[in-house]
Amino acid sequence: MVACKIALATRIRNGIIFAMKSASSFRRVRSSLLLASVLAAALTALPCGAQTTNAPESSTNDATGVAHFPGLDNLPGKHPPHIWNGLAGVWARDHARWKNGASNDVGAVVFLGDSITEGWSSLKRDFPNLKVADRGIGGDITCGVLYRLQEDVLDLDPAGIVLLIGTNDIGNDGDPADVADNTRQILMAIKKFNPNLKVIVCKVMPRSDRNQAVYAARIKQLNALVEDYVKTEPNFAICDTWSIYADDQGVPNPVDFKTDHLHLNAAGYAVWKTALDPVIAKMNFATAKSQ
């Protein structure tokens, strides 16, 4: 910081000397000195390049009020080495849509997650006795959810939350322990907002693409770590969305998945609903107003 200011002062001094040498009259010298002093004030108000901050960028665009993806390094928690390059565009698109209809989702049971949650097109029909809101973003990761939790979920004062997140962390070579820690931070933030708010945490589902065996082992580790934490909290519950889809090797049942062996088809969503129904009943989400 000191070196930066010294360099700045040197630049200003040199500018003044140059102005004095080039002036042909006292009036021009005086004008040049005045200009130099103004420039000095403006330059010293600017931050030096060595300054850094750990605070995340604003979640909204000042001009439109629509939230934009802040960049991987500006997310809280521990992020994977890389992410899907289309996430920023999907993030902006979804937030623009949600901003326009946010008032309609106040008091809803919020389904929070990534593209698997986002793709539940029959969500409202499948839970006719609940007011539900979908806050899934395709390609999202745990630290992305942690970043947008307040604006997308807690600001709605939800009646409950159904969380499914983590497969994109694993798919982008994230460490299961880091992903589990991010998930714990999400849940702790929810508890801090409202200690009585009930949350269903869905286990990360199996996937069968490249490195299937490696992914299966990592997802099992992640699910076990998250479940251990959830069991310590009376207002949190687990929905086992791993074993309802996976065989003994952790390979997803092709009947329930699209051809990418990652995203659910209509049959797969029906299986998820069946698994959720008794957990929702136990958590008494039915207190949410019917739509």
Regions found by a protein language model. Give the residues of each.
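Charged, glycine-enriched surface loops/patches
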Residues: 180-202, 219-236
